[in-house]
């Protein structure tokens, strides 16, 4: 993972890019104090960085691409345009629910297990480099397609209220929950989803 000085540069850029002076919580950000004293929004231990920035009046684009120390980013309920966390191989959790984003790049996030990105304006989402993803929550977007073929570890999938016309559920023996209501699905084969305990596929075009 990148060292503390490099992490500090990433955070200073994040602060500038998203209007840090207008954040609700910004204690000691961009000061010379140790990262451990940058308020409760920053946790940096043993070379691993977690950020808690939900409902903090962030505006603009979050660009943490290449921040190899990042393991968790929670930034729900802000006013953002785009989030780029590509090339963050340790990132395990991203919550950007209800941020208004139209772009999200998680390429190279090989450790990602939990992705919550519902209530945004996403029209595409690339998940080919997220093989360990177990929870995908992406309802209320504008997705016309959703390729989860690389995400064989999925247990919980919520893709409700999008524009999906097909959803390939082949080989999903481990899937426990599926919410896909409010799409344009005409066919949905769940015959191989032997672990499913909760399903809602209403308001589609299924026959």
Per-segment meaning from a language model:
Residues 49-53, 71-75, 92-96, 113-117, ...:
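Conserved hydrophobic beta-strand positions in leucine-rich repeat
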Residues 77, 87, 98, 108, ...:
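Residues on the solvent-exposed faces and adjacent turns
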Residues 56, 78, 99, 120, ...:
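Consensus "Asn ladder" position of solenoid repeat domains
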Residues 61-62, 83, 104, 125, ...:
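Canonical leucine-rich repeat
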Residues 22-26, 100, 142:
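Residue-level signal for secondary-structure boundary elements
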Residues 201-207:
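Short, intrinsically disordered, charge-balanced linker/junction segments flanking boundaries
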Residues 1-63, 68-71, 89, 110, ...:
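N-terminal capping/linker segments that flank leucine-rich repeat
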């Amino acid at each position: 993972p990148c060292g503390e000085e490099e992490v500090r540069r990433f955070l200073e850029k994040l602060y500038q890019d998203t209007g840090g002076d207008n954040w609700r919580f910004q204690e000691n950000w961009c000061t010379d104090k140790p990262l451990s004293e940058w308020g409760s929004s920053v946790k940096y231990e043993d070379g691993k960085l977690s950020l808690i920035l939900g409902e903090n009046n962030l505006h603009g684009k979050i660009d943490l691409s290449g921040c190899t120390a990042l393991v968790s980013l929670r930034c729900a309920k802000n006013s953002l345009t785009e989030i780029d966390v590509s090339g963050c191989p340790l990132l395990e959790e991203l919550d950007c629910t209800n941020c208004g984003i139209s772009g999200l790049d998680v390429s190279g996030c090989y450790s990602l297990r939990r992705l919550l990105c519902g209530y945004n304006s996403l029209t595409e989402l690339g998940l080919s480099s997220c093989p360990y993803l177990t929870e995908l929550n992406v309802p209320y977007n504008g997705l016309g397609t959703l390729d989860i073929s690389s995400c064989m570890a999925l247990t919980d999938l919520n893709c409700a209220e999008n524009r999906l016309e097909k959803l390939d559920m082949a080989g999903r023996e481990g899937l426990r929950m599926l919410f896909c209501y409010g799409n344009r699905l005409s066919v949905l084969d769940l015959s191989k989803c032997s672990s499913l305990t909760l399903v809602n596929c209403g308001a589609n075009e299924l026959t």
